Amino acid sequence: MSFEVLEQLESKIQTAVDTITLLQMEVEELKEDKVKLETEANELRSQREELEQKSQQAQQEHAQWQERIRALLGKMDEVE
């Protein structure tokens, strides 16, 4: 009977070891996924910042053109 108990214990220990091994593999996969997601998030942040800079530059250029047009219209009014 004691041999049967040892076999059951061995089986339970093996199941626990297998479960731990699977969980360790899962943890490693999750760590890899985390690194990939962090990299992707950093790339997206960088792209967003670049787009914000381009947008700001376009707005500044737009404002400059509006000012030039106003100046030209003002000169045209003076001529008339």
Swiss-Prot record:
Keyword flag Transport:
no
Q: Which UniProt keywords apply?
A: Cell cycle, Cell division, Coiled coil, Cytoplasm, Septation
Instruction: Give the chief site where it resides.
Output: cytoplasm
Q: What InterPro entries does this protein map onto?
A: Cell_div_ZapB (IPR009252)
Compartments annotated for it: namely: Cytoplasm
What segments bear the compositional bias annotation Basic and acidic residues? 41-53
Q: Where is this region: Disordered?
A: 41-60
User: What GO biological process terms are annotated to this protein in UniProt?
Assistant: division septum assembly; FtsZ-dependent cytokinesis
Which Pfam family, giving just one, matches this sequence? ZapB
Where along the sequence do coiled-coil regions lie?
3-80
Oligomeric form and interacting partners: Homodimer. The ends of the coiled-coil dimer bind to each other, forming polymers. Interacts with FtsZ.
- Role this protein plays: Non-essential, abundant cell division factor that is required for proper Z-ring formation. It is recruited early to the divisome by direct interaction with FtsZ, stimulating Z-ring assembly and thereby promoting cell division earlier in the cell cycle. Its recruitment to the Z-ring requires functional FtsA or ZipA.
Q: Report the family membership.
A: Belongs to the ZapB family.
Name listed for the protein in its UniProt record: Cell division protein ZapB
The source organism is: Vibrio campbellii (strain ATCC BAA-1116)
The coding gene here is zapB
